Every structure is written in C-alpha cells, then in structure tokens.
Amino acid sequence: GASEHQTGLGLDVYVKNFAGEGFVKSPAGQFVNSESWKYGFIIRYPSYGKSSTGIKFEPWHIRYVGKPHAAIIYNDRLTLEKYIDSFETGEWYSAEGYLISRQEIGESVTMPKAFGSAVISPDNTGCYMITVRNRKSAKRKQGGFLCCVE
C-alpha cells in the first residue's frame, strides 16, 4: 500500500488511558504536540487543518518531514498540504538555514551553485522537494516565511 503508515513516514503514538484526542492530555502527548517539530516531525492532522487535509484533529498521528520543513510548518501553523502548495515549482527558497525547492519529477533537477549535499524526496504530488544546507546567508522575505533565491 501507499498510506503514510505503510511507507514508514507516518506513525501513531499511543499512551495507555489517553486514546484519541485525549492523547494531548498526557505528558507524552503534550511533548509530542509542542516539541516533535524540533526532531523533524509534524502533527499530520492538526486542530486547525481539517479544511485542507479533510481529516479531523489527530494529535497522535505524526509524520517525518525533516527538521527545516517541520520548523516552518510548526512555526507558521501550516498543514503539509498548505506547505507544499506554498512553493512555486522550480524556484529556490531560503529558510531555517536551508535552500528548499519543489521541482517537477523528470530526468534532471536544478541545483544551486556550490552545495555540499542534498536531500531529494518525492512529495506525493508528482514533484520532488529538494533540501540543501544554505552556505550563503540569504535574506528572508519580510512578512513571509520564505524568499526566492536568485
């Protein structure tokens, strides 16, 4: 199958006597909901996201997206869907000390000059998310979480 659980990207966290939405009332649930982004995880179906995910709040369902992506999603209160949609395909953005691009899946991808290593992952919408540690200090766009890199 291709569900988040089957791919290994998503997992459910369980605490005895704190099932379902009650998970956030447990110490572990409070930690997961406030700190998991620091480790590259997001709450896949946040309380504010039903209109974009189609799924009600599931505080126990987390997904690994990587540290820079999780930081942006958490700090800007985005769903994964809204985050992916915020990228103009083919453009490079600077955030959280990284350069990030969403590019069409094809025979080649465009990479920035002078990069050390990159993480290239499919985004499940027909594109790749490319993440490169930023070696230059790029300016952040005022009033937005990302800026285009020229």
Question: What are these language model-derived features?
Answer:
Residues G10-V15, I42-Y45, R63:
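Structural recognition of the beta-strand scaffold that forms the well-ordered cores
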Residues V15-N17, G66, N134:
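Short, flexible loop/turn elements at secondary-structure junctions
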Residues G20-I43, S47:
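Long, well-ordered alpha-helical scaffolding segments within enzyme catalytic domains
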Residues P68-K141, F145-E150:
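Low-complexity, Gly/Ser/Thr/Pro-rich intrinsically disordered linker/tail segments
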